[in-house]
Amino acid sequence: MKTITLNNHNYELIENYKNAYDDQEVQNRFTDYFEPYDYVVGDIAYSSLRLKGFYDTKNKKAKKINDYKNLEEYLKTNCAVDCKYFVLKKID
């Protein structure tokens, strides 16, 4: 898997459905808001990238809305049908 550095943190690209990951696009959208999250998911609809942070289930900050175990539900209910998406996992 590919390792990516964003705001001095390392992430591993663990899923890249339909080749959704675009380094330049992510660099432009990623802010310090996403730094506390264990995972960052990007989905593309109408040619626009949207990012959302998720916590690992073991993280005390995890709630139903941002628990990584609910990723499939998020993709089905909040994203365009069969949209391109990627998942970054924080590794440091």
Regions found by a protein language model. Name each.
Residues 20, 24, 61-66:
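Ordered, soluble secondary-structure elements with a strong preference for glycine-centered loop motifs
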Residues 63-92:
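Helix-rich interaction surfaces within compact, conserved domain-sized segments
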